[in-house]
Amino acid sequence: MVKRFGRFCAAGLWACLVLATGAALWTTCAYAADGELADRVVVHKSEHKLYLYSGEHLMGVYRVALGLSPVGQKERERDFRTPEGHYFLARRNTRSDYFLAIQVSYPNKQDEVRAHKKGWAPGGSIMIHGFPNSPHHPSAYYESNDWTDGCIALSNSDMVEVWMRTQDNIPIDIYP
């Protein structure tokens, strides 16, 4: 009897999670169904904000977390800085260690030249992503601190919206 009740509760919890996630994705899909997709992403590191634009129309503003050393240009692998410059959204990853991930085309040619002049590897795998799938801290930590290795992180709900409102190969400009 207890085993059956436990399985019933687990199945019920799973169903609730699926329905809640499905409802959130459906709402976002309905939101994006108006046909308006962003054609440009802008990040202002000093503001901890990501902006989505369609032409000159501001579509959304999202709070972001950055690398553990958020001030300054990324110069090399493992410096925990978020890059600054002109890049593109390169590809999407649903199997990331984080809730959804969109790769940023860092390093660009200037980044590579700058790093190699100093004898460093420029690093890579800069992503826009949600919170970790296996978190080590409460959500409040990820919401209020810079915690990434250099990536741009959003809450999971904001990540769904950014995912649905963008396409690959659109520009992303990251400013100090």
What are these regions (language model features)?
Residues 1-7:
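N-terminal secretory signal peptides that target proteins for export/translocation
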Residues 57-69:
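Short Gly/aromatic-enriched secondary-structure transition segments
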Residues 36-37, 91-176:
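Exported/periplasmic cell-wall-interacting domains
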Residues 11-24:
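Bacterial N-terminal signal peptides
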